[in-house]
Swiss-Prot record:
The gene is hisB. PANTHER family: IMIDAZOLEGLYCEROL-PHOSPHATE DEHYDRATASE (PTHR23133:SF2), IMIDAZOLEGLYCEROL-PHOSPHATE DEHYDRATASE HIS7 (PTHR23133). It is an enzyme of class 4 (lyase). SUPFAM superfamilies: Ribosomal protein S5 domain 2-like. This is Imidazoleglycerol-phosphate dehydratase. It comes from Shouchella clausii (strain KSM-K16) (Alkalihalobacillus clausii). One of its GO terms (molecular function) is imidazoleglycerol-phosphate dehydratase activity.
Length: 195
């Protein structure tokens, strides 16, 4: 059974069409009008081995806030829907990713209990034209809509681009681990019987 989901979301601020395949090959085709997010989502797909296709337009003449936030919403919804009943998944994922002087860790629990613990500081407020505070907005919406417990910890680093890139790569790897099917797991990995 294919674990993929396709959606379109249109608001007064953004118009997003998206397709996500959890069991992909790391293929990506991303058009958002926000070059830095395109770079990060391309990395996210490659390092998570997800196939991710996104076409988004938004009010980027104002700033990238709405587009970045709504991308988190849409990718989160796609993850949740692609997982279906969550039968057989590992549920938990943990990844450390170094990027030169930076070390980032991301831990995921696909628990149906949304929470974001975000322990990252960015030395610069911008990377190019991209506002770095939007990284938190993206991951909060991702966690909320995917209904996952997401912990992001940057152990150290001083280059803002490296810090953000390490976070996205670590999130991809942790999510790949958490969504992986383990044939030893019968049903859902919870004593409650559901997630």
């Amino acid at each position: 059974m294919a674990r993929s989901y396709e959606l379109t979301r249109t608001t007064g601020e953004t118009d997003i069409s998206l397709r996500l395949n959890l069991d992909g090959e790391g293929k990506a085709d991303i058009e958002t009008g926000v070059p830095f997010m395109e770079h990060m989502l391309d990395l996210f797909a490659k390092h998570g081995q997800f196939d991710l296709f996104v076409k988004a337009s938004g009010d980027i003449e104002v700033d990238a806030h709405h587009t970045t936030e709504d991308l988190g919403i849409c990718i989160g919804q796609a993850v949740k829907e692609a997982l279906g009943t969550k039968e057989g998944i590992k549920r938990y994922g943990n990844a450390f990713v170094p990027m030169d002087e930076t070390l980032a860790q991301v831990v995921v629990d696909l628990s149906n209990r949304p929470h974001l613990e975000f322990r990252a500081d960015f030395p610069s407020q911008k990377v190019g034209t991209f506002d770095t505070e939007l990284v938190h907005e993206f991951f909060w919406k991702l966690a909320l809509e995917a209904r996952m417990n997401l912990h992001i910890i940057v152990h150290y680093g001083h280059n803002t681009h490296h810090i953000i890139e390490a976070i996205f790569k670590a999130c991809a790897r942790a999510l790949d681990e958490a969504t992986a099917i383990d044939p030893r797991i019968k049903g859902i990995l919870s004593t409650k019987g559901l997630l």
